[in-house]
C-alpha cells in the first residue's frame, strides 16, 4: 500500500518515488487492509503534527517536503507504531526508489549530494540496518548493471531487490540480469513488452531463475479482466 510519494509522482523534494507498507502478519486480507488504512491515517496525523502535511502524490500517498529521504522511512515506521502494529513483525516497508529519475549516467543526485552507485548502495544498507524494509524496487539506474550486481550480491539474502525499469519485461534484459545476478525479483508489466507471449516467456524465465515475480498494476488500466 502506497502511503508516501516523492520523485516523479509528487511535487515535493523527496527523491524516492514510493514508500509503501506491507501488512504481512495477519490471518486475512481484510485484517491486512484494515492495518494499511489505519497506518495511512496515522501517517496523516503525524505529518499534520509536524507541520509537514501538504499535497497528495499521483499514487495516492502523502507528498510532504522532507529534509532527507530517510525522514520518510522514519515517518512511515512511526505511523506503523502509532497505529498499534509491530514494525517488521506485522507490517514492513517497501520502497520504489525509481533511481533512474536522479541518475545522470554516472552518479546519483540524492539528498542534494552527487554520489556513486557504490555509495548509494551503502546508503541502502544503512537503511536496511535501521528500518524494517523487505523490498527495494529500482534502487539503481536501468543501465547501471555493476551497481545492481554489487548490491544484490551483498544484500540479496535479506531484502527483495526488484527490477522494473531495469528489465521493462524484456526477455533479453532479463537474461542478462539472471546471468550476472543483478536482482532477485522482477516486476511484470504486460504493456511494456506488448504481447502475452513475450510476457509469459519473461515470467517463465524469471521463475526458473528463482526470482520473485510480481505482477504490476498500471496507472491507466481499465476494469477489464484482460
Predicted regions and their residues:
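Gly/Ser/Thr-rich beta-alpha loop segments that engage phosphate groups in nucleotides
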Residues: 8-9, 62-63, 196, 222
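Catalytic core of soluble alpha/beta enzymes
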Residues: 70-226
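Basic, gly/Ser/Thr/Pro-rich low-complexity segments located predominantly at protein N termini
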Residues: 11-12, 65-66, 199
Amino acid at each position: 500500500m502506497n502511503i508516501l510519494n516523492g520523485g516523479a509522482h509528487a511535487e515535493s523534494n523527496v527523491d524516492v518515488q514510493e514508500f509503501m507498507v506491507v501488512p504481512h502478519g495477519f490471518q486475512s486480507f481484510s485484517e491486512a487492509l484494515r492495518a494499511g488504512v489505519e497506518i495511512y491515517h496515522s501517517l496523516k496525523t503525524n505529518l499534520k503534527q509536524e507541520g509537514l502535511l501538504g499535497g497528495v502524490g499521483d499514487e495516492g500517498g502523502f507528498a510532504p517536503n522532507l529534509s532527507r529521504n530517510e525522514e520518510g522511512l522514519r515517518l512511515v515506521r512511526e505511523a506503523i507504531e502509532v497505529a498499534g502494529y509491530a514494525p517488521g513483525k506485522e507490517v514492513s516497508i517497501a520502497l520504489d526508489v525509481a533511481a533512474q529519475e536522479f541518475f545522470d549516467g554516472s552518479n546519483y543526485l540524492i539528498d542534494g549530494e552527487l554520489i556513486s552507485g557504490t555509495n548509494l548502495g551503502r546508503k541502502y544498507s544503512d537503511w536496511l540496518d535501521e528500518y524494517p524494509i523487505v523490498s527495494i524496487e529500482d534502487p539503481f539506474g536501468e543501465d547501471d548493471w555493476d551497481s545492481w550486481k554489487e548490491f544484490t550480491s551483498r544484500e540479496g539474502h535479506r531484502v527483495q531487490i526488484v527490477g522494473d525499469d531495469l528489465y521493462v519485461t524484456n526477455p533479453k534484459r532479463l537474461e542478462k540480469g539472471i546471468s550476472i545476478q543483478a536482482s532477485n525479483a522482477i516486476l511484470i508489466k504486460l504493456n511494456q513488452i506488448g504481447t502475452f507471449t513475450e510476457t509469459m516467456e519473461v515470467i517463465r524465465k524469471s521463475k526458473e531463475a528463482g526470482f520473485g515475480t510480481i505482477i504490476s498494476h498500471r496507472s491507466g488500466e481499465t476494469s477489464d479482466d484482460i
